[in-house]
From Swiss-Prot:
Gene: nusB
GO terms assigned for molecular function: RNA binding
Family: Belongs to the NusB family.
Protein name as catalogued: Transcription antitermination protein NusB
Function text: Involved in transcription antitermination. Required for transcription of ribosomal RNA (rRNA) genes. Binds specifically to the boxA antiterminator sequence of the ribosomal RNA (rrn) operons.
């Protein structure tokens, strides 16, 4: 029987990462800075503030580190829209999902997309789940090439000759 509690924990971590990205954009800082500040506050106080789930921090740091590439990839697959015109929560959901598609090797692509659609159902407009699914479906088509190119570049930077 699968560990549904672990799945729920990862779902909550993604939702919290979306919250952090949303807050970061509203405050004009990075999600990594919000996560760092939140964990620092939790360490100083002993009341009801808990440290963030490590996966939430990983996602926040990953989206921050790869923000330009993630936004370019999302923008390339928006039809009739610009990233700035999307609801802020949809931007945050798409950023988390695209980071997972590109960088979370332990997350199967369909899981990343399904989780994003679920978050859109919970947090955004009635049209958002279908929109998020459509954009991520297009991103999934190019994900293997992007991962392969990143691996090739990584090999080249590690002194590999490629032959």
């Amino acid at each position: 029987m699968p560990d549904r509690k672990g799945d729920r924990g990862r779902h909550q971590a993604r939702k919290r990462a979306v919250d952090l990205l949303f807050e970061a954009e509203a405050r004009g800082i990075t999600a990594a800075e919000v996560a760092e500040a939140r964990n620092a506050l939790a360490e100083k106080r002993t009341d009801d503030i808990a440290t963030l789930n490590p996966y939430t921090v990983t996602v926040a740091q990953g989206v921050t580190a790869h923000a330009a590439h993630i936004d370019d990839l999302i923008s390339a697959h928006l039809q009739g829209w610009t990233l700035d015109r999307l609801p802020a929560v949809d931007r945050a959901i798409l950023r988390v999902a695209v980071w997972e598609l590109l960088h979370a090797e332990d997350v199967p692509e369909p899981v990343a997309v399904d989780e994003a659609v679920e978050l859109a159902k919970q947090l955004s407009t009635d049209d958002s789940p279908g929109f998020v699914n459509g954009v991520l479906g297009q991103v999934m088509l190019v994900t293997p090439q992007i991962r392969a190119a990143a691996a090739a570049m990584q090999g080249g930077h590690n002194g590999g000759s490629g032959t």
